Curated annotation (Swiss-Prot):
This is Methylthioribulose-1-phosphate dehydratase. Pathway: Amino-acid biosynthesis; L-methionine biosynthesis via salvage pathway; L-methionine from S-methyl-5-thio-alpha-D-ribose 1-phosphate: step 2/6. Catalyzes the dehydration of methylthioribulose-1-phosphate (MTRu-1-P) into 2,3-diketo-5-methylthiopentyl-1-phosphate (DK-MTP-1-P). Binds 1 zinc ion per subunit. Its EC number is 4.2.1.109. Belongs to the aldolase class II family. MtnB subfamily. One of its GO terms (biological process) is L-methionine salvage from methylthioadenosine. Keywords: Amino-acid biosynthesis, Lyase, Metal-binding, Methionine biosynthesis, Zinc. HAMAP family: Salvage_MtnB. GO terms for cellular component: cytoplasm.
Length: 210
């Protein structure tokens, strides 16, 4: 019953994401942990705004094996990595929004630091705009196992919280439930839009001051 409730919540989140335009042209992928050994991952090439329960494939978390023989998302290995790293993660959302994609390219360092925004409190455990939220940025790579190794290497020394960006690609975020993952996604997207607008205004102000 719990699995059905969570899958229903994930389907609703996917349809909402589709309406937001955060996964255009069948991009993005979503997943749900079932237990310590298995998860459900979206099938490759499916429009996220019109997914059904049949579009989620059973995947073995340890080795990415799909018993059905169907093809899951090409980035399944990043989902299963997160489930192996953090037992508390129960849902992962990967989106391709304009704000996340552009901001990940504008920011030249390997992390995006968000500071001074009240909406930082949309992220679990954040209590004040005076704190900083650090979102790692990884260079994009079509070799997903190699990208997963880089994510795992960072996580060994700096535990990942809320999400990470893949440069020029998009956002991965998660939560201990579908509802928390969805809240983190909405909060981060708002923060990304604020940060992008702030940088644009700063650039225009500096240009006008010359």
């Amino acid at each position: 019953m719990t699995e059905n409730v969570q899958l229903g919540a994930l389907l609703a989140a996917c349809h909402w994401i589709g309406e937001k335009g955060w996964c255009p042209a069948t991009g993005g992928n979503m997943s749900l942990r079932l237990d310590s050994a298995q998860c459900l991952v979206t099938e490759s090439g499916k429009d996220k705004g019109s997914l059904t329960a049949d579009d989620f494939l059973l995947v073995e978390t340890a080795n990415n094996h799909v018993p059905s023989g169907r093809t899951p998302s090409a980035e399944t290995g990043l989902h299963t990595l997160l489930y192996r790293l953090y037992p508390e993660i129960n849902a992962v959302l990967h989106t391709h929004s304009v704000n996340a994609t552009v901001l990940s390219r504008v920011e030249r360092s390997n992390e995006l630091v968000l500071h001074g925004y009240e909406m930082q409190k949309s992220l679990s455990g954040q209590r004040s705009h005076l704190d900083s939220v650090v979102i790692p940025i990884f260079d994009n790579d079509q070799d997903i196992p190699a990208l997963a190794q880089r994510v795992a290497a960072l996580a060994d020394n700096h535990p990942l919280r809320y999400g990470f960006l893949v440069r020029g690609h998009g956002l991965y975020c998660w939560g201990n439930s579908v509802s928390e993952a969805r809240r983190h996604l909405e909060g981060l997207e708002f923060l990304f839009q604020c940060e992008l607008q702030r940088r644009l205004l700063d650039a225009n102000f500096k240009l006008g001051a010359k």
